[in-house]
From Swiss-Prot, chain A:
Protein name as catalogued: Protein farnesyltransferase/geranylgeranyltransferase type-1 subunit alpha
GO cellular component: CAAX-protein geranylgeranyltransferase complex; cytoplasm; protein farnesyltransferase complex
Organism: Saccharomyces cerevisiae (strain ATCC 204508 / S288c)
Subunit composition and interactions: Farnesyltransferase and geranyl-geranyltransferase share a common alpha subunit (RAM2). Protein farnesyltransferase is a heterodimer of alpha subunit RAM2 and beta subunit RAM1. Protein geranyl-geranyltransferase type-1 is a heterodimer of alpha subunit RAM2 and beta subunit CDC43.
Enzyme class, broadest EC rank: transferase
Length: 316, 376
């Protein structure tokens, strides 16, 4: 790390020990020194290499300081225009940001800062973003900011080609990863004008295979319903899906509704709920829906019994 | 609160008060990173104390002068010399020739001043027009959403900041506190139609709100509270409302029925979370989501208490995440209590008791008093 000289900067020291202060913080000497300098340089709007270095040090101690990101961006934009190789300069900034990202997984400013850099970049590349995305998802496979950023990249680069395979890999690792499941929906919503019937049939098979593996998993069932509604005008597969869902509920529909102990276990309450929703939409199968909701209330998902009774009321 | 009809209360009220009080006192240097958002610490503490019936205006009234110092007004360098104003989170952020006010610190400060009953401030000192103008400048003209701060030099909406439903909520809540009620009131400062369009674009396929179709209880609460403050909940279709109620109730973790099959297989499932709420599908329950989910449900249906059997979530909070030794609430049963989860855990309990204004996240009685006294 290069050493910069700040000796000519007159710091704007932070006031401490104020009267009637709430949540007084015992600042370290280092924090006071850094903030004193940063306040002075921001106030002067000095756009220089040493100011850039200082922002890195501030981000290290206070990554939530929104103005410092803004300041850093203005410095980068200014110095980029003075540098001989803009691409190289911005890539170096992205490299720096990768390191900061790894150390601050929950900070959200990082991601919008990254977006600003890519918008500034003359030749941005999705491929360059993949390693940091991978590291962050390996660390926390459901990190909302990281997933949102990945989706932003897909839209920014208009590139969705790797998304289904990527989501499949993550579902392979953890079949309960809801972020990966909703990523598939994101894919279809944004790619839906260019997809074939074969692809849709493959996707349906993918969902059914995963449900077969673990029937009691809310994510693929929710996704299945959304997927079906999204493409309801494109493919007729209602009976196939209904037959499939029925295989997870045994013969409970034909049994009398008695006490919970008399009812057998079934493999999936979500299958039963899926069927109830489907049956409820058609007056001819409404009785089945009422029975399915009653079974959910009595035995298979009793914590939501008042919801199931509410659904029955809606049907009547 | 939560006083059982017989027997002692399960809520360790005194410990909670002490917990919140501690956060308003001297904090170790490990809190330096939160210095920029110190108004958040103040808000969570004062809100927590108010929930536990501490007379905060008497106890902390002496600090109003220091609080007021965080309000910064800037005259812009334009032809009309218009002014904008708002709050910084900490005086460290008050930098000459740089605009550093932001929306979250502004809302946290305003709500704290309301709880401290500094009505004189609202009636005579706070410049509501310039404050609303600051909010207005945070709106993105292209999307209708809000960023949280302005470029420190140009005073245009920051191009480095993110925009999302949280900041939309905060923007609208600030305007509401400034007296905006009707659509015309809001339209004076922001493009309400465009904002509504943005909120509607964040609806997810199977109900609830989130970015790019991944529903999230926190964003759902922000979206619904915003719509409520804009008197626009009826913009949502009946199907979407029903789907959202269903989605929210599914966030209540259960150890019964088929759900117990998950205990061996799902790494993010714990049977002992029974009754608590999670933020998204297949995640552990977490104290704060009890508030986000309950607040959302309460905005959508008058039957919310019956639908989610509030005694179950009360048990989850009191038996699993309440810290009986230190006071406060933790995120889950493993971690120590933290301020954010302590405030929201307490808020969830107060909401169940009908004593809490969920849209503004302060006790209802305090808001009623404020509305009575300060009608602008
Ligand atoms: Zn939480």
């Amino acid at each position: 790390m290069e050493e910069y000289d700040y000796s000519d900067v007159k710091p704007l020291p932070i006031e401490t020990d104020l009267q009637d202060e709430l949540c007084r913080i015992m600042y370290t000497e280092d924090y006071k020194r850094l903030m004193g300098l940063a306040r002075a340089l921001i106030s002067l709007n000095e756009l220089s290499p040493r100011a850039l270095q200082l922002t890195a040090e501030i981000i290290d101690v206070a990554p939530a300081f929104y103005t410092i990101w803004n300041y850093r961006f203005n410095i980068v934009r200014h110095m980029m225009s003075e540098s001989e190789d803009t691409v190289l300069y911005l890539n170096k900034e992205l490299d720096w940001l990768d390191e900061v990202t790894l150390n601050n997984p929950k900070n959200y400013q990082i991601w919008s800062y990254r977006q600003s850099l890519l918008k500034l970049h003359p030749s941005p590349s999705f491929k360059r973003e993949l390693p940091i995305l991978k590291l962050m998802i390996d660390d926390d496979s459901k990190n909302y900011h990281v997933w949102s950023y990945r989706k932003w990249c897909c839209l920014f680069f208009s590139d969705f080609q790797h998304e289904l395979a990527y989501a499949s890999d993550l579902i392979e690792t953890d079949i309960y990863n809801n972020s990966a499941w909703t990523h598939r929906m994101f894919y279809w919503v944004n790619a839906k004008d260019v997809i074939s019937k074969v692809e849709l049939a493959d996707e349906l098979q993918f969902i059914m295979d995963k449900i077969q593996l673990v029937p009691q998993n809310i994510s693929p069932w929710t996704y299945l319903r959304g997927f079906q509604e999204l493409f309801h005008d494109r493919l007729q597969w209602d009976s196939k899906v209904v037959d499939f869902a029925t295989t997870f509920i045994g013969d409970v529909l034909s049994l009398p509704i008695g006490s919970p102990e008399d009812l057998p276990e079934i493999e999936s309450s979500y299958a039963l709920e899926f069927l109830a929703y489907h049956w409820g939409a058609d007056p001819c199968t409404r009785d089945n829906a009422v029975k399915a909701y009653s079974l959910l209330a009595i035995k298979y998902d009793p914590i939501r019994k008042n919801l199931w009774h509410h659904k029955i009321n809606n049907l009547n | 609160m939560c006083q059982a009809t017989n027997g002692p209360s399960r809520v360790v009220t005194k410990k909670h008060r002490k917990f919140f009080e501690r956060h308003l006192q001297l904090l170790p240097s490990s809190h330096q990173g939160h210095d920029v958002n110190r108004m958040a610490i103040i808000f969570y503490s004062i809100s927590g104390l108010s929930i536990f019936d501490v007379n905060v205006s008497a106890k902390y009234g002496d600090h109003l002068g220091w609080m007021r110092k965080h309000y910064i007004k800037t005259v812009l360098d334009d032809t009309e010399n218009t002014a904008i104003s708002g709050f910084v989170g900490s005086l460290v952020m008050n930098i000459p020739h740089a605009t550093t006010i932001n929306l979250p610190n502004t809302l946290f400060a305003l709500l704290s001043m309301i709880m401290l009953r500094d009505y004189e401030y609202f009636e005579t000192i706070l410049d509501k027009r310039s404050l609303a103008r600051f909010v207005s400048k945070c709106q993105r003209p292209d999307r209708g959403s809000f960023v949280s701060c302005l470029d420190y030099k140009t005073n245009c909406g920051s191009s480095v900041d993110s925009d999302d439903l949280r900041f939309c909520y905060i923007a609208v809540a600030i305007l509401y506190i400034c007296g905006c009620r009707s659509k015309e009131d809001f339209d004076e400062y922001i493009d309400t139609e465009k904002l509504l369009g943005y909120i509607m674009s964040q609806q997810c396929y199977n109900g609830a709100f989130g970015a790019h179709n991944e529903p999230h209880s926190g964003y759902t609460s922000c979206a619904l509270s915003t719509l409520a403050l804009l008197s626009s909940l009826e913009k949502l279709s009946d199907k979407f409302k029903e789907d959202t109620i269903t989605w929210l109730l599914h966030r209540q973790v259960s150890s019964h029925g088929c759900m117990k099959f998950e205990s061996e297989l799902n790494a993010s499932y714990d049977q002992s979370d029974d009754g608590g709420f999670q933020g998204r599908e297949n995640k552990f329950a977490d104290t704060c989501y009890a508030f986000w989910c309950l607040n959302s449900l309460h905005l959508l249906t008058k039957d919310w208490k019956m639908l989610c059997q509030t005694e179950l979530v009360t048990n989850y909070l009191l038996d699993r995440t309440q810290k009986t030794l230190t006071g406060g609430f933790s995120k889950n049963d493993e971690e120590d209590a933290d301020l954010y989860h302590s405030c929201l855990g307490s808020a969830a309990l107060a909401l169940i008791e009908g004593k809490f204004n969920g849209e503004l996240c302060i006790p209802q009685e305090i808001f009623n008093d404020f509305s009575k006294r300060c009608c602008f």
